[in-house]
């Protein structure tokens, strides 16, 4: 075990504070509409240019181990805020640095760190309650666009694109962001359920020009196992032929003789048919097949359920208005499933999302939910260079997360105004002793930090801006750094999601309060470079 270096009390907190300030100084320049970009060197490829606070924070690693501990703790604030709210990472960093800076001063002056921490917790709880009380529900598509525009650094085109996407697929729908192959940024909406499995044979194609299968009003057979022979299916195939409708066959795989028989029937015109592999793997495949069955009002043919292929009747098959299949994907449009059954399935998936602790499982469940609930929208991000595309993609990700948070918990005035006005919740609030009350006053001062930083980044004196707003009776009055004027933030469309503001303060207060209570720091002593090897062993005395 290597030797350790130990630091105590004020010396320890000073080193922590130095690390916190270094990280904060790198991140805070990105705050607000006139915030600057940060250029990050990469081990390979072009440098990355970003205005995303958490991306900057994640790149910072300091040489001094004690300073690095402080930086890493605040980096944790940015990451946690990003995970919970998806935006507000720079605000969280600025708040954490302000709370820790003031707290460290008071501890150095002889106040009790544990009482200060209690005061900070009291202050944060009161402010969060105030923010929740003042939040306004998002009512229209234009309000969603406003939230997206602010989070995308004032890019109205991005805000409108996200609002359009949410309008098409609903609040539960999946909106994904991908890199485009062109210079244009565009929105592509897939209605109905789409999964990433294409036709098993190009002979199934009905539209040769677009190389895709188009089935109108088809029956859908959902089968769990592989199909090697069609012997057991003959009764149901004959029943489908009698109706004159097409058939889509979804199963684990269709092999050899079975596939050849289907292709021959299709080419001879006896049966309009197409076959695709089932999406997913293992248990997830079974769940997705059940989703398709619910969506199309059919039954999954599974021996686990006691249903065999030779017993299948027409009423066990699913049904949809239209099915489109290309080489890589299958889209089922307007399935005839009952609304109540689909809604029950949606609630079941939502319950699973609440229970799961795995991010990967959560993401896959969200995808299933979206496919049942509304559809999928894809924003394809274009740009002149790869660096520009990546920077734009960061902003769209932030905007997307912000709009989802706004729909969830409502909106508050943006530009740091919500936190500044929430100071009223702390007026007259005192603790059980002077040190706890001092902890509350730390939060009171920190609430001004974001708006001061936004003003500083716009070239204004933060103190003057805060002073001017303090004299206004309009709770929505704020400083628009873009136009450099004082406006009603709600009327001007400068809004923040309440969830983002609340999460930023809670995470910042939690980590900063912990840092204040740190009394001892322990780190490995850096290993000295070993001395160079002294010549060839055993050859030293040979007189050469």
UniProtKB/Swiss-Prot annotation:
Keyword Nucleotide-binding: yes
Pfam (any one): Cpn60_TCP1
Signal peptide region: none
Entry GO CC: cytoplasm
Protein location: Cytoplasm
SUPFAM superfamilies per UniProt: GroEL apical domain-like, GroEL equatorial domain-like, GroEL-intermediate domain like
Description of how the protein assembles with itself and partners: Forms a cylinder of 14 subunits composed of two heptameric rings stacked back-to-back. Interacts with the co-chaperonin GroES.
Function: Together with its co-chaperonin GroES, plays an essential role in assisting protein folding. The GroEL-GroES system forms a nano-cage that allows encapsulation of the non-native substrate proteins and provides a physical environment optimized to promote and accelerate protein folding.
Name the UniProt record assigns to this protein: Chaperonin GroEL 3
Organism of provenance: Rhizobium leguminosarum
């Amino acid at each position: 075990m290597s030797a350790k270096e130990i630091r105590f009390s004020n010396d320890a907190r000073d080193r922590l504070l130095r690390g916190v300030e270094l990280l904060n100084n790198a991140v805070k320049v990105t705050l607000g509409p006139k915030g600057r970009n940060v250029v990050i060197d990469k081990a390979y490829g072009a440098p990355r240019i970003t205005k995303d606070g958490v991306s900057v924070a994640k790149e910072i690693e300091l040489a001094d181990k004690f300073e690095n501990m402080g930086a890493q703790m605040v980096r944790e604030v940015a990451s946690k805020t990003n995970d919970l709210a998806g935006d507000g990472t720079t605000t969280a960093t600025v708040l954490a640095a302000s709370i820790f800076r003031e707290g460290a001063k008071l501890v150095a002056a002889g106040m009790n760190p544990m009482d200060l921490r209690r005061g900070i917790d009291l202050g944060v709880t009161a402010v969060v309650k105030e923010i929740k009380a003042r939040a306004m529900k998002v009512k229209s598509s234009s309000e969603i666009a406003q939230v997206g525009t602010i989070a995308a650094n004032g890019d109205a085109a991005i805000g409108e694109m996200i609002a359009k996407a949410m309008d098409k697929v609903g609040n539960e729908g999946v909106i994904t962001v991908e890199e485009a192959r062109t210079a244009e940024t565009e929105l592509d909406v897939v209605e109905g359920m789409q999964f990433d499995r294409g036709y098993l044979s190009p002979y199934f194609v009905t539209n040769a020009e677009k190389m895709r299968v188009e089935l109108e009003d088809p029956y859908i057979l959902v089968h769990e196992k592989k199909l090697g022979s069609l012997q057991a299916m003959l009764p149901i195939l004959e029943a489908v032929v009698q109706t004159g409708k097409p058939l889509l066959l979804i199963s684990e795989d269709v092999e050899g003789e079975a596939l050849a028989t289907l292709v021959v029937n299709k080419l001879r015109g006896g049966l309009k048919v197409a076959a695709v592999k089932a999406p997913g793997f293992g248990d997830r495949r079974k769940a997705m097949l059940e989703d398709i069955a619910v969506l199309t009002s059919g039954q999954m043919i599974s021996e686990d359920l006691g249903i065999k292929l030779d017993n299948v009747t027409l009423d066990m098959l699913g049904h949809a208005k239209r099915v489109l299949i290309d080489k890589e994907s299958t889209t089922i449009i307007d399935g005839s499933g009952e609304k109540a059954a689909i809604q029950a399935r949606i609630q079941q998936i939502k319950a699973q999302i609440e229970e799961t602790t795995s991010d990967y499982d959560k993401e896959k469940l969200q995808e299933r939910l979206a496919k049942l609930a509304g559809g999928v929208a894809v924003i394809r991000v274009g740009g002149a260079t790869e660096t520009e595309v990546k920077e734009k993609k960061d902003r769209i990700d932030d905007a997307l997360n912000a709009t989802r948070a706004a729909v969830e918990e409502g909106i508050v005035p943006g530009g740091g105004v919500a936190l500044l006005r929430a100071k009223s919740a702390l007026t007259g609030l005192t603790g059980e002793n002077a040190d706890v009350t001092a902890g509350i006053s730390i939060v009171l001062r920190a609430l001004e930090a974001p708006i001061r930083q936004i003003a500083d980044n716009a070239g204004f004196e933060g103190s003057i801006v805060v002073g001017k707003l303090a004299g206004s009776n309009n709770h929505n009055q704020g400083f628009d750094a873009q136009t450099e004027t004082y406006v009603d933030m709600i009327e001007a469309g400068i809004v923040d999601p309440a969830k983002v503001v609340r999460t930023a303060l809670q995470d910042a207060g939690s980590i900063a309060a912990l840092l204040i209570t740190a009394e001892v720091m322990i780190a490995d002593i850096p290993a000295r470079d070993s001395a160079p090897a002294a010549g060839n062993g055993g050859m030293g005395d040979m007189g050469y």
